[in-house]
Every structure is written in C-alpha cells, then in structure tokens.
C-alpha cells in the first residue's frame, strides 16, 4: 500500500480546527497465519491542516488490503502512516475494530499528533 494511491484536496477551512470522521465498516484483509479472511471496521478521525482525504480514493485504497496477509496491528499502523504521509494532518487517529475471531475481539488504536 502507498500514500501515492490516495488523492487529496485543499482544506476549505484551514484557519480552523475541525474534526473529520470516516468509517469503513466493511474492511477486509487476510490473516497471515491462517490465510482466512479477517473482517472489521476502520475508523479514521483527523483534524486537517492544508489537505483533506478524497473519499473515492480512500475507498479504493482500503480495497487494496482485501487479499493481503497482514496482522491487525500492522494494518492499523500502515493506514495511519499512509494517511499522514498523504495529508500531513494536525492530528489523526485510526482505530481498527476487528470482528470476533476464536472468541477474542481485538481493537487497535494508532495516533499521530504534530509537534508544537
């Protein structure tokens, strides 16, 4: 995955801090150990600086994970890293809320904050 597949657009209100929340409730990837599909919801919350994420490109970016073997922890952090690289937000949190598997539920949260 790469932030180069993500399109952006200028923040229409760069002088103001405001929060954008995006949910991807049908996220899928593959367990790298078993090869079985993993299902979950990815929630992205961010305060933009000069750029915002274009949603159609974000949808296609998320689809790229569908057949990729990747751990929950890795995918959550990878999404955060790619989105931060694409838009350099003031702050961002990505939550991977994965479906129950083997009687266990996993939620992974990764955050980014600008220094200053």
Language model regions located:
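N-terminal intrinsically disordered, cationic/polar leader segments
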Residues: 1-116
């Amino acid at each position: 995955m790469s932030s180069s597949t993500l399109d952006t657009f200028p923040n229409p209100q760069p002088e103001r801090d405001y929060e954008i929340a995006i949910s991807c409730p049908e996220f899928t990837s593959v367990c790298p150990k078993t090869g079985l599909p993993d299902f979950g919801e990815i929630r992205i919350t961010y305060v933009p600086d000069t750029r915002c994420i274009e949603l159609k490109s974000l949808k296609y970016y998320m689809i790229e994970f569908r057949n990729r073997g990747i751990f929950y922890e890795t995918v959550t952090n990878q999404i955060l890293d790619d989105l931060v690289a694409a838009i350099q937000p003031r702050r961002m949190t990505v939550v991977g809320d994965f479906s129950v598997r083997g009687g266990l539920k996993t939620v992974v949260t990764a955050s980014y904050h600008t220094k200053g």
